[in-house]
Amino acid sequence: MQKIRRDDEIIVIAGKDKGKRGKVLKVLADDRLVVGGINLVKRHTKPNPMSGVQGGIVEKEAPMHASNVAIFNGATNKADRVGFKVEDGKKIRVFKSTQKAVDA
């Protein structure tokens, strides 16, 4: 079970975007995440009239390592860590500081 999943709200704790918040768009296999509006890079694309792609400089989100982000706890308005607890025979994610369920 992963500590950070798609659609989780996270806060960046290290790097050029430190302090920014965003939603996880994609979780990649090698502990990397794509977060909306964070870690933007510019890509130069060639025009391709066959597929209708207009050329130019396109800004897009690049993957960042999961160690540079922390899950955002809305109750405390701070970054938090994730732990696991078994309730009713199911393993759930909980915030370490408040012991409340992440997916609640």
From Swiss-Prot:
Organismal lineage: Bacteria, Pseudomonadati, Pseudomonadota, Gammaproteobacteria, Pseudomonadales
Organism encoding this protein: Pseudomonas syringae pv. syringae (strain B728a)
GO CC term (a single one): ribosome
Presence of the UniProt keyword Ribosomal protein in the record: yes
Family: Belongs to the universal ribosomal protein uL24 family.
Full protein name: Large ribosomal subunit protein uL24
GO biological process, one term: translation
General function of this protein: One of two assembly initiator proteins, it binds directly to the 5'-end of the 23S rRNA, where it nucleates assembly of the 50S subunit. One of the proteins that surrounds the polypeptide exit tunnel on the outside of the subunit.
SMART domains: KOW (SM00739)
Subunit note: Part of the 50S ribosomal subunit.
Membrane spanning residue stretches: none
Keyword vocabulary terms for this entry: Ribonucleoprotein, Ribosomal protein, RNA-binding, rRNA-binding
Gene Ontology terms for molecular function: rRNA binding; structural constituent of ribosome
Keyword Ubl conjugation annotated: no
